[in-house]
Curated annotation (Swiss-Prot):
Residues 1-48, 74-152 are annotated as: Disordered. Residues 74-84 have a biased composition (Low complexity). SUPFAM superfamilies: HMG-box. Keywords: DNA-binding, Nucleus. GO terms for biological process: chromatin organization. Residues 135-152 have a biased composition (Acidic residues). Residues 1-15, 85-109 have a biased composition (Basic and acidic residues). The keyword DNA-binding applies. This is HMG1/2-like protein. It comes from the Eukaryota.
Length: 152
């Protein structure tokens, strides 16, 4: 059987040509993870939804009524159940507070974005980008020229 291959041999893929699909998928994900920018600590936090505004108050009441219950999940489940039973009229104050915080957040974000846009163009950062040795070298050059004149 010089020229022909058996059916089982022809069905098998050449191991040298095989592509590791799992490895290729993980390799594709890695660069995306590296490119993720670090979070800016000065960036304003997103405003809470009406439900989370409700949760702030509900948590205080629930903890007073059930001091022995330390599970976060129990508080969340109880709050969710109560929120579902509330009418739109009962939810209205929380929605209003949420909208107020949203307007404040948008104002803060405009100020933050304006500050970010102005930041890189500022002249102060150019001086701070110089290393300490570069600044010291400039000072030494100025002092050195003054010392040479004293010797004359």
């Amino acid at each position: 059987m010089k020229g022909g291959k058996s059916k089982t041999e022809s069905k098998r893929a050449d191991p040298k040509l095989a592509v590791n699909k799992k490895g290729a998928a993980t390799k594709a994900r890695k660069p995306a993870g590296k490119g993720k920018a670090a979070k800016d600590p000065n960036k304003p936090k997103r405003p809470p939804s009406a439900f989370f505004v409700f949760m702030e108050e509900f948590r205080k009441v629930f903890n007073k009524e059930h001091p022995e219950n330390k599970a976060v999940s129990a508080v969340g489940k109880a709050a969710g159940a109560k929120w579902k039973t509330m009418s739109d009229a009962e939810k209205a104050p929380y929605v209003a507070k949420s909208e107020k915080r949203k307007v404040e957040y948008e104002k803060n974000m405009r100020a933050y974005n304006k500050k970010q846009a102005e930041g890189p163009t500022g002249g102060d950062e150019e001086e701070s980008e110089k290393s300490v040795s570069e600044v010291n070298d400039e000072d030494d050059d100025e002092e050195g020229s003054g010392e040479e004149e004293d010797d004359d």
